[in-house]
Amino acid sequence: MAILNILEFPDPRLRTIAKPVDVVDDGIRQLVDDMFETMYEAPGIGLAATQVNVHKRVVVMDLSEDRSEPRVFINPEFEPLTDQMDQYQEGCLSVPGFYENVDRPQKVRIKALDRDGKPYELIAEGLLAVCIQHECDHLNGKLFVDYLSSLKRDRIKKKLEKIHRQQA
């Protein structure tokens, strides 16, 4: 397994729309393993392949405190099941150190393939619903900062660019 490099906003590669996975093979399973290792090391609770510069529709997630609930979503799709919205303070491994409130549908149906390529479906609410929507946004080239006002988004962008310049 390997720790992968996580792209950071405003890297334009984060805007790439990921392509569907045609076949879940050993290469995809290795990507899943590497993504879990990267996510746990970061540490985070979710990671989309786009964030590690692999533009395939793959998401890993683990909302548990003890890394006991790893979830894999290959070619995930979600459908809101309610008009009710929840507001969560979201953060992102690609926007390190920043947290902002984002409104998202409270309940969603998720369809995806598992690590073995088997289709499954689940109904998600709360944090799981928020996370799958957040990670699917990554696969579509969208970040949580896109839900913010342009003023807030520009402020975050400038702060991160300054940090990147100082690290160079």
Curated annotation (Swiss-Prot):
Top-level taxon of the source organism:
Bacteria
Looking up InterPro entries in the UniProt record yields: Peptide_deformylase, Peptide_deformylase_sf
BP GO terms, sorted: co-translational protein modification; translation
EC numbers: 3.5.1.88
Instruction: Give TM segment ranges.
Output: none
- Name the active site residues: E135
Catalytic activity reads: N-terminal N-formyl-L-methionyl-[peptide] + H2O = N-terminal L-methionyl-[peptide] + formate
Q: How is the cofactor bound?
A: Binds 1 Fe(2+) ion.
Q: Which UniProt keywords apply?
A: Hydrolase, Iron, Metal-binding, Protein biosynthesis
Physiological role: Removes the formyl group from the N-terminal Met of newly synthesized proteins. Requires at least a dipeptide for an efficient rate of reaction. N-terminal L-methionine is a prerequisite for activity but the enzyme has broad specificity at other positions.
Name the family. Answer: Belongs to the polypeptide deformylase family.
What is the protein name for this chain? Peptide deformylase
This chain's source organism reads Stutzerimonas stutzeri (strain A1501)
Gene name per UniProt: def
